[in-house]
């Protein structure tokens, strides 16, 4: 059974066998939050004061950048931000807070030339350990978006050397070992090209699977598609049958990542389109991205607190095959996640004994509770309730 001919059924046959060999424990609820959300206007302005320290088991601050093999501190306010974030642990000592380096804007180029030589990698690793310890972080998340085929060895070596250094630091420290995680792609071609999965599985504590952005206004031909479908749609053929959470999770496990190290990403935002005709279903022709939201101000993209406003007067359809909703109002189409789809996704990950759920990101949920009339953090709370013990 070659990977090139792997379909959903044969993929899951192998995964079920693997799952029978693995046990489960308490689930993780890993919550990213972004340092640019503090610059948004109300009600989207998000600061550490908005964080409930008991909401998530792990918080990941996104993103720090690297320059000259060291993490950059932009200004004193960023140091103050680190202190405020990590002070949440005085209220909840069980909370783990990680620093994420990289991200979409930093891209792959940002990791060069640091990864290119053992000397520069060592300089970075020594500096990051010192940085994490000095600022009271519990670990590092590497969000290299994404290593290409030539770079996957660099990525593997960087992760391995970080893991070894974290272990060495732990043996001479009175503190717990620093955690090491990575934000990784959910695209099959990217998984094949970017990651030496079996090696990464030995060195990472867990992966944060970016199981969203499966469809958006960047695609050609430009047609509507859901941001994060749980399952394959009836119309999906060929490569598009891989563009769903179920396939991505199964493929990572098939490639050698233990299920308990897979933390499945669930988005608190949707992707939107401007419809090109009267057709409104999934796969309907679109003329471009949807109109920008009033707070996030990015075309083709809406945070959940903006989606709630959009839903007033919109027609909502729940996709029975993909198990997620979309909404249409006028010529605007948005595919998003709601409380029900969150609960369905958590049941899916529990059935597979995954490590838990990851939220991208808590600052795009209705964290104030003022936009959706569902209380603060309705989506994250739905995930938390469904997961049970953390």
Curated annotation (Swiss-Prot):
Reported tissue expression: Highest expression in chondrocytes, followed by synoviocytes, lung and heart. Not detected in spleen, pancreas, and liver. May also be expressed in developing brain and placenta.
GO terms, molecular function: carbohydrate binding; chitin binding; hydrolase activity
Function: Lectin that binds chitooligosaccharides and other glycans with high affinity, but not heparin. Has no chitinase activity.
Pfam families: Glyco_hydro_18
GO BP, sorted A to Z: carbohydrate metabolic process; chitin catabolic process
Taxonomic source organism: Homo sapiens
Listed CDD domains: GH18_chitolectin_chitotriosidase (cd02872)
Major site of localization recorded for this protein: secreted
Membership in a protein family: Belongs to the glycosyl hydrolase 18 family.
Residues annotated as domain GH18: 27-390
Compartments in which it is found: Secreted
S-S bonds: 31-56
Tree of life domain: Eukaryota
Signal peptide (from-to): 1-26
UniProt cross-references to Gene3D superfamilies, sorted A to Z: 3.10.50.10, Glycosidases (3.20.20.80)
Keywords from the named record: Chitin-binding, Disulfide bond, Glycoprotein, Hydrolase, Lectin, Secreted, Signal
Entry-listed glycosylation sites: 35
Protein's recorded name: Chitinase-3-like protein 2
Residues holding chitin: 75-76, 102-105, 146, 210-213, 360
Record-level GO cellular component terms: extracellular region; extracellular space
InterPro entries: Chitinase_II/V-like_cat (IPR011583), Chitinase_insertion_sf (IPR029070), Glyco_hydro18_cat (IPR001223), Glycoside_hydrolase_SF (IPR017853), Glycosyl_Hydrlase_18 (IPR050314)
